């Protein structure tokens, strides 16, 4: 009898200890999740979708392993052009690994680029249906980026991908959104991302009513020799032309280019290759002026 009483006492003590430490463990887990040291616990729907075996592995702290295997399966969906299944699988992946920007980015790329283009080119579908699916999957990809940013607000790569998506000429561009996304990419990249800084300017310059902000940014970027690429030089010239006041052509060209020959060649290519519809203010006038100056020599 004493033996069973001891067993009962031990069980009561264990249950009491578990009950007492449960709030502490829950609070500790919450803090670890907030700090990014642990993945959030799986919800019931996710457990059901990945199956009992995978759920057991994930609960054992190996959610990244499960996500990797599902990612391999998602590649099969890509090869089969089964876009709904691919979307479903990436929703599972990001539920398992919400702090991995890679999965958010790849999911967005598959949906906004691969799926959207595939649906647009499926000749067996009516034209209206193709266009609707094309737009729908572009937005699905954008939604993945937004959710990824919510989970990883300090990751510059997702902001950069969002900027690239919204600036793409074939994806119903919104240059205001693109400019802000690139600005945040540059900011979260601690000001070291020169490509994102230039992309910020390219987008901002195409937003109506943002001429002053664009020229201020262009001047700031041009102070850094790394940013003095051909397109920045030409864009700065076009923006300076808008605000030139009493300044002469010679002054404007000298500010943006090293010499007349370089200016003529860069402006010619900038004007000729303008599929992205960058500002062209003063470009034709400058090209004609440079041609006349060359003829005088």
Residue ranges and their predicted role:
Residues 5-23:
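Hydrophobic membrane-insertion alpha-helices, especially the h-region
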Residues 211-297:
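Terminal, low-structured helical/coil segments at or just beyond the last alpha-helical repeat
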Residues 207:
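Active-site or metal-binding loop neighborhoods of secreted/extracellular toxin and effector enzymes
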Residues 23-155, 160-187, 198-204, 212-216:
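Short coil/linker segments at helix-helix boundaries
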């Amino acid at each position: 009898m004493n033996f069973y009483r001891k067993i009962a006492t031990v069980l009561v003590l264990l249950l009491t200890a578990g009950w007492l430490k449960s709030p502490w463990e829950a609070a500790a887990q919450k803090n670890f999740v907030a700090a990014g040291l642990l993945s959030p616990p799986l919800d019931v729907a996710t457990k059901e979708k990945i199956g009992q075996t995978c759920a057991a592995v994930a609960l054992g702290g190996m959610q990244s392993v499960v996500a990797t295997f599902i990612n391999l399966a998602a590649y099969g969906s890509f090869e089969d052009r089964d876009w709904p299944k691919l979307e479903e699988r990436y929703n599972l992946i990001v539920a398992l690994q919400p702090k991995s920007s890679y999965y958010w980015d790849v999911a967005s790329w598959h949906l906004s680029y691969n799926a959207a283009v595939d649906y647009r080119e499926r000749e067996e579908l009516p034209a209206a249906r193709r266009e609707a699916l094309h737009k729908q999957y572009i937005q699905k990809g954008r939604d993945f980026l937004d959710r990824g940013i919510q989970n990883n607000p300090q990751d510059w790569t997702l902001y950069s991908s969002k900027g690239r998506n919204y600036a793409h000429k074939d994806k119903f561009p919104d240059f205001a959104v693109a400019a802000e996304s690139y600005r945040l990419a540059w900011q979260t990249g601690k000001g070291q991302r020169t490509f994102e800084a230039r992309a910020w300017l390219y987008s901002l310059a195409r937003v109506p009513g943002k001429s002053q902000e664009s020229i201020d940014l262009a001047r700031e970027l041009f102070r850094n020799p790394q940013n003095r690429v051909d397109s920045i030089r030409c864009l700065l010239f076009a923006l300076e032309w808008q605000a030139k006041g009493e300044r002469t052509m010679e002054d404007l060209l000298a500010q943006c280019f090293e010499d007349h020959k370089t200016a003529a060649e860069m402006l010619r290519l900038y004007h000729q290759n303008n599929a992205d519809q960058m500002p062209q203010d003063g470009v034709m006038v400058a090209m004609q002026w440079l041609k006349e100056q060359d003829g005088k020599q």
